[in-house]
A protein has these predicted regions:
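Asparagine-centered strand-capping/turn motif at beta-strand->loop junctions
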Residues: 3-9, 191-193
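Short Pro-Gly-centered flexible turn/kink motifs
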Residues: 2, 145-162
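Beta-strand-rich binding/interaction modules
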Residues: 186-215
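Aromatic sugar-binding surface patches on proteins
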Residues: 218-226
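Surface beta-strand/loop "capping" patches
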Residues: 165-197
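A contiguous, surface-exposed recognition patch within enzymatic or periplasmic domains that forms
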Residues: 7-152
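Short, hydrophobic/aromatic beta-strand segments
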Residues: 9-16, 168-169, 199-203
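Short coil/turn motifs at secondary-structure junctions
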Residues: 6-9, 162-163, 207
């Protein structure tokens, strides 16, 4: 929980971004919510397509850590979703951030670079890392917000782990869900939850058509996946 109080009789500026570092490697992907189609830079001076965009003379999927050579900050142009995720496909595990997007609109990732020198300088023998970042009352840096005299503001944010489902297309405080097209006639659906559910109903629909319906027990230390 984040609480900020202005104890002065004057209007004050503030900037707050939460920063979680995660292990990064060639299997790591940043997953902005699916309806994110643009990214932007600091101060919103440049915009790019997301996730596939031009890097030099190549078209690259820049959601993957391996496709960056130098340092980079990318902010999601997204003002409607409450979550951000990142996933290590080698470890088959990842991280979800969840918060009210009206209060925590900022979604960003930062990396120093993918060369080995950064490992030596920053983590010694612990490997590369990437920063998942979220902004409270701010969607960019340095995009300051303002707080009035004697005003108090607060917000609550949540981070939780996911595994076994290949990332997330949607997430709430209770669960993360992934949906992937495997072939023209098949798909994968997977869930992680943040509390235990017994005999939970799983329903997958396309419009009014029921594609799958079943029951399962699921808890935070397990996952559900069906192809």
């Amino acid at each position: 929980k984040f609480i900020i109080q202005n104890r002065t009789p004057f209007m004050q500026s503030f900037l707050y971004w939460a920063n979680v570092s995660v292990h990064a490697n060639n299997d790591y992907q940043v997953q902005f919510p699916p309806n994110t189609v643009y990214g932007t830079s600091h101060s919103k001076t440049q915009y790019t397509n997301w996730p596939v965009t031009a890097v030099g003379d190549q078209e690259l999927d820049t959601s993957w850590w391996k496709n960056w050579k130098g340092s980079n900050s990318t902010f999601a142009v997204n003002y409607s979703d409450d979550f951000l995720s990142g996933y290590d496909f080698g470890a088959d595990a990842g991280t979800i951030h969840f918060a009210n997007h009206h209060v925590v609109p900022g979604k960003k990732f930062f990396l120093w670079g993918t060369e080995s020198v950064w490992n030596e300088m920053l983590t010694e023998e612990d490997g590369a890392y990437l920063e998942l970042m979220v902004g409270t009352y701010s969607d960019n840096q340095p995009d300051y917000s303002w707080i009035g005299p004697n005003e108090v503001r607060s917000t609550t944010q949540y981070w939780y782990p996911i595994k076994g489902i290949g990332g997330a297309k949607e997430a709430t405080l209770e669960a993360a869900v992934n949906l992937e097209r495997i072939s023209p006639s098949s798909m994968m659906v997977g869930f992680n939850v943040t509390e235990k559910y017994n005999n939970a109903r799983v329903l997958v629909k396309e419009g009014d058509k029921v594609l799958y319906e079943g029951r399962t027990d699921i808890a935070p230390d397990t996952f559900w996946k069906k192809e």
